[in-house]
């Protein structure tokens, strides 16, 4: 036990804080007091994740209904699938078998894939907060995965090496800089368990890459570098599609076996800064000026 303790990170729901976590800490301290252990605390870090919730449904007799028994009609009303009777929609609560507000993950995976489910759950809210499961959310995640795959189809596999930034079109050079910025942002977010922020940075980055004009000087290598990096950054969150992206781009071996990308701090320095414009103490707008501009 002295070799393996303390555990680096404990992850558990709020119910663990008054059961397993309490017992684990108590027995560890007791064993330390008795001289059997060298550590008093069994865990270095604690992270408590939120719960997944869903709307609750009742039929006309007050019995609970599961989500797959309910349909929203054209008028926006919830009705029973079997007889079309009105269904009462209750507030979103933690998924439980007693209230039948659970969603079968097998059906979701069969329809949208595991990556879409992972992406939706990670992007919907900070992991320490509760989240509500919605069909629109999982569909949005699925559409984004399809967009990522289309980006691979539009990326040249024989683009050649990156040129120096001063030999590229400005827009292509900006994508290279955006790639290094995304590496820094996503890395920091993942290390801090801010998975929703990591997804937001990945989406922002992919939007920028998608807008790059393929005809610009240096755009081909810049896009390939960006899309390869995008796959690497998204791999912990969406492992299945990013492995396919990596293979389609000609990557060697499994993406999961590759080293995590590192950023160049020099490329994170902004060429311009945004200044607020005030008139008589009231903000009237903003202007972008060169970072080295004279006062």
Q: What role is predicted for each listed range?
A:
Residues 2-86, 90-118, 131-152, 224-235:
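Structured ligand/cofactor/substrate-binding pocket environments in proteins
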Residues 289-295:
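Glycine-rich, small/acidic residue-mixed loop/short-helix segments
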Residues 53, 282-284, 294:
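Generic "edge-of-domain/loop-turn" microfeature
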Residues 22, 26, 36-42, 107-288:
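Helix-rich, typically C-terminal accessory recognition domains appended to large enzymatic cores
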Residues 48, 288-289:
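Hydrophobic/anchoring residues in structured secondary elements
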